Every structure is written in C-alpha cells, then in structure tokens.
C-alpha cells in the first residue's frame, strides 16, 4: 500500500525538524520569552564547523535580554547580561571580560527576553545534579513546560565552581580536565571555591537538547562574578544555601 498523504507530510515535517535542529535553527520563533537559537552543538560536533551563525551586533540588547554562547572559531565565550554583551577571549589569566567588537560573530548562541521573574531561596546547599533537578521541579510548579527551553538566573555563593573559556588555540588533554573535552579548541580552565556571583543559564528541554546544550545534557550555564568582570562557560558547580533562583514568568 502506498503511503498516505498524511504519512508523507509527517515524514517531511520530521525531516525538516531534524535538518533545522542540526543547522541550529529558526524553530525557535514563536516560543516563550522570545527564545532564539543560533548554531548547534550537535552539528558542530559532527562537522567541526565553528563558523559564525549570527553577528553579535544583530543580537537583542534591550533590558531583559539574556544569552549565552561562544564566538566563531571557538575563540571566546559570550554572555548577554540584561542587554549588555560581555565577551571573554581567554586572554586574561583572571578571566576578565571585554566589550564585543563590531566584527564578532557567534558559532553557538541562545537568547531570551524576560520581563518578569519569579524568585525564591534555595533551601539548602545542593550539588549540580540535585540543583538542576530542583530547577526543573520549580519550573513545573509555576507552569513552565519542561519539554521547552527557558532561561533562569541564580545569585549567591557557590562553594565549588569550575568554568572555562575557549581560546581557539589547539586543544590538549589538560584542557579537558575541568569539564567538557572540546576537540575543536583549547580552553583556559578556572577552578574556584566559595565565589559569589550569578549563573545565567538556559534549560534546553527535549526540543533543543544538543542544540543549545551539549548532546545528552539539558543545561547551558555561564558564570559571571559579582563585579560583572569575569565570566565563562560552567562545567561543574555547587550552589550554596540561600542562593536566589529566578525563573521566568509567562
């Protein structure tokens, strides 16, 4: 029996979905919080293509705009912090950031705009896995769909914090010691304890897992210190008791 038109349409839709996810796509349009994604971790891992997918000059910079990503060529980390772009090129031994350059592009970037946050304190110190489960649980309580992406913030003390900045230089085995082994670029790794600051984070949901987060993971998190002077991609962490979790309100 030949396939029905409905079956063909479904197959075409699935093929388009897969292609868009691998390309890092515009499927984000219409999602809550003006969520947008450029590039794809999965595609980058498969192809080694780290070329620019969006110009930083074209990213939203209004108040309430948040985002995380990496520069083209994996030559640095990007943080969009409440409308302000902060770039870390891995050149500073303290991980300090600088302003974006006109020519900068992102190989990977996820962004959203939040007009209102729901916030609450963390009842106890939590390791990474427990905290991430807590985030999803709290998100569901305020009506967020755990299958879809959303941003969140965490402010407080972090008893343990390991983060890195990709540098674009050749990778070496030592570069993977603190977190993700990235075969495309070297990285400067920072291991700290008892630091204060903020996590700017995105939960991918099932829909954008492997696109805005590493394959097999659902969180893409950047750290910025309390002075907003140092920032990078988070590999491992613990969150201290009393830290404030902020989730977006629909």
Functional labels for PLM-detected ranges:
Residues 30-58, 66-75, 92-216, 231, ...:
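Cysteine-centric segments in proteins
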Residues 78:
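Cofactor- and metal-binding active-site motifs of prokaryotic enzymes
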Residues 84-86:
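Hydrophobic residues embedded in beta-strands of well-ordered beta-sheets
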Residues 216-222:
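Histidine-centered divalent-metal-coordination microenvironment in nucleic-acid enzymes
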Residues 23, 232-233:
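Short, flexible, surface-exposed loop segments at domain boundaries
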Residues 224-226:
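A generic structural motif
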Residues 14-25:
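Bacterial N-terminal signal peptides
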Residues 2-15:
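Bacterial N-terminal signal peptides that target proteins for export
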């Amino acid at each position: 029996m030949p396939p029905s038109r409905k079956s063909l349409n479904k197959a075409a839709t699935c093929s388009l979905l897969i292609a868009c996810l691998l390309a890092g796509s515009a499927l984000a349009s219409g999602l809550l919080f003006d969520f947008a994604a450029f590039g794809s971790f999965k595609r980058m891992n498969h192809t080694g293509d780290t070329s620019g997918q969006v110009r930083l000059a074209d990213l939203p910079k209004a108040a309430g705009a948040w985002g995380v990503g990496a520069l083209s060529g994996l030559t640095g980390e990007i943080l969009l912090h409440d409308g302000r772009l902060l770039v870390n090129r891995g050149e500073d031994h303290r991980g300090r950031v600088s302003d974006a350059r006109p020519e900068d592009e992102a190989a990977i970037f996820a962004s959203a705009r939040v007009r209102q946050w729901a916030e609450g304190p963390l009842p106890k110190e939590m390791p990474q896995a427990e905290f991430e489960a807590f985030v999803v649980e709290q998100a569901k309580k305020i009506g967020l769909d755990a299958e879809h992406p959303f941003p969140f913030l965490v402010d407080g003390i972090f008893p343990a914090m390991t983060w890195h900045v990709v540098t674009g230089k050749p990778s070496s085995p030592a570069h993977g010691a603190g977190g993700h082994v990235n075969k495309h670029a070297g990285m400067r790794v920072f291991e700290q304890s008892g630091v204060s600051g903020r996590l700017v984070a995105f939960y991918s949901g099932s829909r954008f897992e492997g696109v805005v987060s590493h394959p097999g993971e659902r969180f893409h998190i950047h750290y910025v210190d309390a002075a907003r002077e140092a920032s990078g991609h988070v590999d491992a962490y613990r969150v201290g008791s009393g830290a404030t979790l902020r989730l977006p309100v629909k």
